[in-house]
Curated annotation (Swiss-Prot):
Protein name, entry field: Biotin biosynthesis bifunctional protein BioAB
UniProt source species: Bacteroides thetaiotaomicron (strain ATCC 29148 / DSM 2079 / JCM 5827 / CCUG 10774 / NCTC 10582 / VPI-5482 / E50)
Subunit structure: Homodimer.
GO BP field: biotin biosynthetic process
Role noted for this protein: Catalyzes two activities which are involved in the biotine biosynthesis: the conversion of dethiobiotin (DTB) to biotin by the insertion of a sulfur atom into dethiobiotin via a radical-based mechanism, and the transfer of the alpha-amino group from S-adenosyl-L-methionine (SAM) to 7-keto-8-aminopelargonic acid (KAPA) to form 7,8-diaminopelargonic acid (DAPA).
Pathway: Cofactor biosynthesis; biotin biosynthesis; biotin from 7,8-diaminononanoate: step 2/2; Cofactor biosynthesis; biotin biosynthesis; 7,8-diaminononanoate from 8-amino-7-oxononanoate (SAM route): step 1/1
Length: 741
């Protein structure tokens, strides 16, 4: 074996073996080892340095006999003794550390575990800190159970720290009053309640290099992503007071090995690092340290935050604005106390996204399915610039303008012939709201005010606003929390006949029975035609739409198509209704309408709908968004629609579809995979179990691709301008990561 082979193995995403790690530990050329570890660090690990500070919230004599610990009651040391600090003092120190750009603040207590009263006090302190500070909260409080950890998590503590300290084979030599199995039980409980975990240990306690390797592999098996590495500072009075300090070369070699074994983790320098020379500290940052506990430690002095920051920046790491982002910006579908990771983007061009750290990602999501032309397109850029020189916005009430008129002229030839009226809206969700209101007002105007409810199919998604949520699946959808507050709609099973399979006539029966029973109160049936998007990425048979249309006409019910996600070529047809040849009464479009540049949607309706509403009091449709018909958005939309029609979109989508079918096919044989389905420029891998979004997204980024999975779905919706080579990188990266599950 060679260093190059082992390094390439890690860079390719494969784990190394214990034998390979031992070979690395014994190689003579330390500098070559450090350089290889550095390459792994800059390729696989985060470049954004993570700083944590701690507060020794309670110090005293502990019943455990850990040989390294100054707070053990078994040894005579000079460690301070004091009870739990007041919550106000914890807050004061948390706010100070936040002002120093520290990411995390950890509450630490001595002893096996706090009393129930102290747990309650610590929860109160956490709530106080969350109320007055945005710093992320961690805790290291000993061997806790799931109930105690859940209380802490509810109070705002998002990460739990419990060190295994050393290799499983060596731990009993250092402590006999508790076991590593008890520590592992605490870590497992923390994960079950939704906490992230932090777990590492101390080197230099008499263990061998082989045992350090064993320890690093133990942490890798646990998939720990925050690994504190403490250097023993022998404390007078403890059994290890005369332990010889490790050489700087041995410390650096250990860090390198930890990086080879845990390539993506935050290796967090913690206690004892003050014994290193500045040169060795810089070398440690070079080799693999990308995180640190700053300030004073528990029983040993630490370092000044300002000094640490200066050195960290000089070694090529950065403190991005993502800290402010984490603390103050609430991203979609995530927590503020334990947010999903975000990756800061520097720019985007074509089918690529460039992160602030320089990494380039192939775009697989089209920014939630809207950027069909890719990014930074000169035609769309110019359209926006030209319109800015004229006007960016005027109200659409009582005024009109060329961009809105021109966009309407472009859209009408593309949509069903019966669609003759266009109502501009702000977003996809708002378009659905408008469509539902339009249906209700239509029946009111038609003299049937009792027809004010809706029917739809399960596993649907129509948006995040109030009435849009009401027609999303109330059980499997993302809005079940609001179910008891939303208007009650009628839901029938989604058709299981595949788009490219045989049609089962029985699939229409539940819809027929529901419509027959409730037709007098139903205003409309709303459907995502052919493709159910965020509700499950399912492609159903076109015959369902034909049968549904017959039922709607037979029972005097409007048909609404939500083409927000499917419109503008995504399914291989310009709009998905074309697969079935079924024309709706009302249709919603959005997302790709502006090529992903600006938010804009439109609701299209027949003359019958519009005229009926307009000829009955109040003789107007009662909806008017502030930014309705925004001229800047309309101008870009005009350019986007023209660009799509002139770009050979149909050939591009056929090419993408063929390549997705060929290159995702191997996933059908994976034991982790339940289904693979392709339609147009949509590729879906459905897994047997739910995916970890944070973990898989990080792995996708490491592969140089941008994919955002959810639930049991890993899917691709690339821009239509993606090259075959870029698409191959996407598909190969997806297959690799799914295979790892």
């Amino acid at each position: 074996m060679t260093l190059q082979e082992i390094k390439d193995q890690v860079l390719a995403g494969f784990d190394i073996s214990s034998a390979q790690a031992t070979w690395l530990a014994n190689m003579a050329d330390s500098e070559a080892l450090y350089a290889a570890a550095h390459e792994i660090t800059i390729t696989c690990a985060s470049h954004e340095f993570d700083m944590c500070s701690i507060i020794n919230a309670k110090s005293g004599r502990c019943p455990e006999n850990c040989k390294w610990c100054a707070q053990s009651s078994h040894y005579k040391t000079q460690a301070e003794i004091y009870d739990l600090l007041p919550a106000e003092e914890c807050l004061r120190q948390a706010k100070y550390n936040e002002s120093q750009d520290v990411n995390r603040f950890s509450l630490v207590t001595s002893g096996r575990k706090p009393s129930p009263k102290q747990i309650s006090q610590l929860c109160d302190a956490a709530r106080l800190m969350r109320k007055h500070s945005s710093i992320q909260l961690c805790a290291s409080l000993g061997l806790l159970n799931e109930e105690e950890l859940r209380a802490l998590h509810t109070a705002g503590i998002t990460r739990y720290h419990c060190n295994l300290e050393t290799a499983p084979s060596y731990f009993p030599t250092l402590c006999s009053t508790h076991t590593q199995e008890q520590k592992l039980a605490t870590l497992d409980a923390a994960r079950r309640v939704g906490m992230d975990i932090c777990c590492g240990g101390i080197i230099g306690m008499g263990e061998t290099m082989e045992q350090r390797i064993e320890f690093a592999f133990t942490l890798a098996e646990l998939n720990v992503q925050s690994i504190p590495i403490n250097l023993l500072s022998p404390i007078p009075g403890t059994p290890l007071e005369n332990e010889k300090a490790l050489s700087e070369e041995e410390i650096l070699r250990t860090i390198a090995l930890f990086r080879f074994i845990n390539p993506t983790a935050f290796l967090r320098f913690a206690g004892g690092r003050s014994q290193l020379t500045p040169e060795a500290m810089r070398k440690a940052l070079f080799v693999g340290i990308n995180s640190a506990i700053v300030g004073d430690l528990l029983t040993t002095l630490g370092s000044k935050v300002s000094d640490d920051k200066k050195m960290i920046l000089e070694e090529g790491y950065h403190f991005a604005d993502s800290q402010f982002d984490r603390e103050h910006l609430w991203h979609p579908y995530t927590s503020t106390t334990d947010p999903l990771p975000v990756y800061k983007v520097k720019r985007a061009d074509g089918a690529t996204i460039t992160l602030e750290d320089g990494r380039t990602l192939i775009e697989g999501m089209s920014s939630w399915w809207c950027a069909v032309h890719g990014y930074n397109h000169p035609v769309l850029n110019q359209a926006a610039k030209d319109q800015l020189d004229k006007m960016s916005h005027v109200m659409f009430g009582g005024l009109t303008h060329d961009p809105a008129i021109e966009l309407g002229k472009l859209l009408l030839p593309l949509v069903p012939p019966s669609m003759q009226k266009i109502f501009y809206a702000d977003s996809g969700s708002v378009a659905v709201e408008v469509a539902l209101k339009m249906a209700v007002q239509y029946w009111y105007a038609a003299g049937k005010p009792d027809k004010n409810n809706f029917v739809t199919i399960r596993s649907g998604y129509h948006g995040d606003t109030w009435n849009a949520m009401s027609v999303c699946d109330p059980v499997t959808g993302m809005h079940s929390l609001f179910g008891s507050s939303l208007p009650v709609r009628y839901f029938v099973p989604a058709p299981s006949s595949r788009f490219d399979g045989e049609w089962n006539p029985d699939e229409i029966i539940p819809l027929r029975e529901t419509i027959e029973k409730h037709s007098k109160e139903l205003a409309a049936l709303i459907l995502e035609p052919i493709v159910q998007g965020a509700g499950g990425m399912w492609f159903y048979h076109p015959q369902y739409l034909r049968e549904a249309e017959k039922l709607c006409k037979e029972h005097d019910i409007l048909l609404i198509f939500d083409e927000i996600a499917t419109g503008f070529g995504r399914t291989g047809k310009l709009f998905a209704w074309e697969h079935a040849g079924v024309e709706p009464d009302i249709m919603c479009i959005g997302k790709a309408l502006t090529g992903g540049y600006m938010t804009l949607s439109a609701v299209l309706a027949s003359n019958q709908i519009a005229d009926t509403i307009s000829n009955h009091a109040p003789k107007a449709f009662m909806h008017g968004p502030t930014f309705m018909g925004n001229p800047l958005a309309c101008a870009v939309a005009c350019a986007s629609v023209r660009l799509l029609l002139d770009s050979g979109w149909a050939e591009n989508v056929k090419r993408i579809e063929a390549q997705l079918k060929e290159e995702l096919a191997p996933a059908r044989k994976f034991p982790q995979v339940a289904d693979v389905r392709i339609l147009g420029a949509i590729g879906v891998i459905q897994t047997e179990r739910s995916v970890s979004m944070a973990y898989m997204q990080r792995r996708f980024v490491e592969e140089g691709i941008w994919v955002r999975p959810f639930g049991k779905l890993v899917y691709l919706m690339p821009p239509f301008i993606i090259s075959p080579e870029q698409l191959s990188k996407l598909t190969s990266g997806v297959l690799k990561i799914v295979r790892e599950m």
